[in-house]
């Protein structure tokens, strides 16, 4: 059934992969998160900078780990772990008390960095495999989604902060 859908609607599958890749651009949208994080957790600009640095470092390490996990267990496993880590980072940060600013590093930066990194190679390699005849286009669509994600997430988060505080 899944194979039939993919065969009949290949561009829908690629669009879904691109939509998922928008989430991997979370580090590119850090600027919109920085001020609310500083206010909520009592972090200085330097402390928020450390949170961002840890997010980026976790992303870098996570790309290697996510690629390894994908080779061993497949892209579905890597994507599920990535989704769980990313969502877990947001949920943990949401329930973290405001006085525990240092906890933000552990609760959000590490799991969100790893989660976005686990998603990145799984979607990219699947696009290249499924669109073997159009690897360049498939890679371009997925890469373009990552590039546009910083702008999209920035606009989305700003609207959400205005609407929900």
Where are these regions (language model features)?
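C-terminal ends and interior cores of transmembrane alpha-helices
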Residues: 84-98
């Amino acid at each position: 059934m899944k194979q039939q859908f993919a065969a009949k609607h290949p561009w829908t599958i690629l669009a879904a992969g691109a939509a998922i890749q928008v989430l991997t651009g979370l580090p590119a949208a850090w600027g919109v998160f920085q001020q609310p994080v500083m206010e909520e957790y009592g972090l200085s600009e330097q402390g928020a900078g450390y949170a961002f640095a840890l997010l980026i470092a976790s992303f870098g390490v996570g790309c290697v780990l996510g690629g390894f996990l994908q080779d061993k267990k497949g892209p579905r496993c890597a994507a599920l772990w990535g989704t769980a880590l990313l969502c877990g980072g947001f949920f943990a940060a949401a329930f973290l008390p405001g006085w525990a600013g240092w906890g933000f590093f552990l609760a959000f930066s590490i799991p969100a960095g790893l989660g976005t990194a686990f998603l990145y190679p799984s979607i990219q390699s699947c696009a290249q495999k499924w669109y073997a005849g159009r690897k360049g286009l498939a890679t371009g669509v997925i890469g373009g989604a990552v590039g546009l994600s910083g702008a999209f997430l920035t606009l989305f988060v700003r609207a959400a902060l205005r609407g929900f505080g």
